[in-house]
Curated annotation (Swiss-Prot):
Gene: speD
Origin: domain of life: Bacteria
Gene Ontology cellular component terms for the protein in this record: cytosol
Protein name: S-adenosylmethionine decarboxylase proenzyme
Cofactor annotation: pyruvate
Family, per entry: Belongs to the prokaryotic AdoMetDC family. Type 2 subfamily.
Pathway, per record: Amine and polyamine biosynthesis; S-adenosylmethioninamine biosynthesis; S-adenosylmethioninamine from S-adenosyl-L-methionine: step 1/1
Organism annotation: Clostridium botulinum (strain Alaska E43 / Type E3)
Gene Ontology MF terms: adenosylmethionine decarboxylase activity
Length: 272
């Protein structure tokens, strides 16, 4: 489902609603030795460096119909990356844009050690969090993306693209609408589009791969969806190892440990 411009509400003045999408994905991997765990973290760090994350966020900006004003990005030592993009709902004349904004020009970005993106009213940010523990054979990787917009632009239109951009075993999505605008008669509007569930904006083929749970507070315009991958294809969770090198009994044990890790992350509770 897309939030289109058809059947537009007739508003008085500017649309003052703020729509914020918080999107977290978790990728889980089996890495038995400390060497494998460190290699996995290094691999993830390279796969999702600030340059690739910048490209993803620029695509998101285009999908929601916004325009890049400024980009800031940074890779961290020993691992992790961050990107922030400031966006505007409509194209602005060059003379209207603050001189500190780089408009996402790559040649400018190459001359800076740190890059941040800005919108006139809105922003898009991403941070990565690789993680492992030497006493645990499982390593994880979290991507935290926030898209906040004002006006007619809604970030939920980019959900399918975001899910497809990462290897997602667990997904948590929060969407909220704040503020109010007015119609032409002066009546307050606390939301300007219909929504009953975040799942309404996720492709059916994607939903079939996950168990999904909603927790919504409609009177507060708060929507929350959690998703857990249904099937574990073990080969996809092994780092630099072939599944056939592992004995069947150990395969089952690894699958059980992966599933337990996913369930705890999904529930936000130490269960096992």
């Amino acid at each position: 489902m897309m939030l289109g411009l058809e059947n537009k509400l007739k508003l008085y003045g500017f649309n003052n609603l703020t729509k914020t999408l918080s999107f977290n994905i978790y990728d889980v991997c089996y890495a038995k030795s400390e060497r494998e765990q460190k290699d996995y973290i290094a691999y993830i760090d390279e796969q999702y460096n600030s340059e690739r994350l910048t490209n993803i966020l620029c695509d998101v900006t285009e999908m929601i119909g916004a325009h890049v004003l400024n980009i800031s990005k940074q890779d961290y030592d020993p691992q992790g990356a961050s990107v922030t993009i400031l966006i505007s709902e409509e194209t602005l004349a060059v003379k209207e844009i603050d001189k500190s904004c780089n408009l996402g020009q790559i040649d400018i970005l190459k001359t800076r050690d740190t890059i941040v993106g800005h919108l006139d009213k809105s922003h898009v940010t991403v941070h990565t969090y690789p993680e492992y523990h030497p006493d645990n054979s499982i390593a994880t990787f979290r991507v935290d993306i926030d898209v906040s917009t004002c006006g007619e632009v809604s970030p939920v239109n980019a959900l399918n693209y975001l899910i497809g951009s990462f290897d997602s075993d667990i997904i948590t999505i929060d969407y909220r609408v704040r503020g109010f605008t007015r119609d032409i008669d002066g009546k307050k509007l606390f939301i300007d589009h219909k929504i009953t569930s975040i799942q309404d904006y996720i492709d059916e083929n994607t939903l079939k791969k996950y168990d999904a749970v909603d927790i919504n507070v409609y009177q507060s315009n708060i929507f929350h969806t959690k998703m857990l991958i249904k099937e574990i294809e073990l080969q996809n969770y092994l780092f630099n190892r072939d599944v056939y090198e592992i004995k069947p009994k150990q395969r089952l044990e690894i699958e059980n440990n992966l599933r337990k890790e996913m369930i705890e992350i999904f529930s936000g509770t130490n269960i096992y």
